[in-house]
Amino acid sequence: MDVKHIAKQTTKTLISYLTYQAVRTVIGQLAETDPPRSLWLHQFTSQESIQDGERYLEALFREQPDLGFRILTVREHLAEMVADYLPEMLRAGIQQANLQQRCQQLERMTQVSEANVENSNLETPE
């Protein structure tokens, strides 16, 4: 297991997600202050894949550099706000999700075992 590679890929995914959130934030801000630009950014976003945040921003900078810089600023602000909470929330979230999965699997296994016992009791002649 290459932990460094996993960390890099996780970081890339998180950066793209924060880019997505920054775009949503800017679209919302523009909807209140400049509806035509909000509509333009919304349409641009529907045409350009935001899956890779960096490629999305490169395309946006070619079209509307000021919006690109605005999204960079919002993304950086979001990263600063989230960074303090993320490690503990990640650990707690994984632990909780794993616990729920284990409980559900145990319930399924128990139900299957009970069904097998009931079926074997029905098949046993008395």
UniProtKB/Swiss-Prot annotation:
<comment type="function">
    <text>An RbcL-specific chaperone. Required for assembly of the RbcL8 core. The central cleft of the RbcX homodimer (RbcX2) binds the C-terminus of a RbcL monomer, stabilizing the C-terminus and probably preventing its reassociation with chaperonin GroEL-ES. At the same time the peripheral region of RbcX2 binds a second RbcL monomer, bridging the RbcL homodimers in the correct orientation. The RbcX2(2)-bound RbcL dimers then assemble into the RbcL8 core (RbcL8-(RbcX2)8). RbcS binding triggers the release of RbcX2.</text>
</comment>
<keyword id="KW-0143">Chaperone</keyword>
<dbReference type="GO" id="GO:0110102">
    <property type="term" value="P:ribulose bisphosphate carboxylase complex assembly"/>
</dbReference>
<dbReference type="InterPro" id="IPR003435">
    <property type="entry name" value="Chaperonin_RcbX"/>
</dbReference>
<keyword id="KW-0602">Photosynthesis</keyword>
<keyword id="KW-0120">Carbon dioxide fixation</keyword>
<comment type="similarity">
    <text>Belongs to the RbcX family.</text>
</comment>
<protein>
    <recommendedName>
        <fullName>RuBisCO chaperone RbcX</fullName>
    </recommendedName>
</protein>
<dbReference type="GO" id="GO:0044183">
    <property type="term" value="F:protein folding chaperone"/>
</dbReference>
<keyword id="KW-0963">Cytoplasm</keyword>
<keyword id="KW-1282">Carboxysome</keyword>
<dbReference type="GO" id="GO:0031470">
    <property type="term" value="C:carboxysome"/>
</dbReference>
<dbReference type="InterPro" id="IPR038052">
    <property type="entry name" value="Chaperonin_RbcX_sf"/>
</dbReference>
<dbReference type="GO" id="GO:0005737">
    <property type="term" value="C:cytoplasm"/>
</dbReference>
<dbReference type="Pfam" id="PF02341">
    <property type="entry name" value="RbcX"/>
</dbReference>
<comment type="subunit">
    <text>Homodimer. Interacts with the exposed C-terminal peptide of RbcL via its central cleft, contacts a second RbcL monomer via its peripheral polar surface.</text>
</comment>
<keyword id="KW-1283">Bacterial microcompartment</keyword>
<dbReference type="InterPro" id="IPR046381">
    <property type="entry name" value="RbcX"/>
</dbReference>
<dbReference type="GO" id="GO:0015977">
    <property type="term" value="P:carbon fixation"/>
</dbReference>
<dbReference type="GO" id="GO:0015979">
    <property type="term" value="P:photosynthesis"/>
</dbReference>
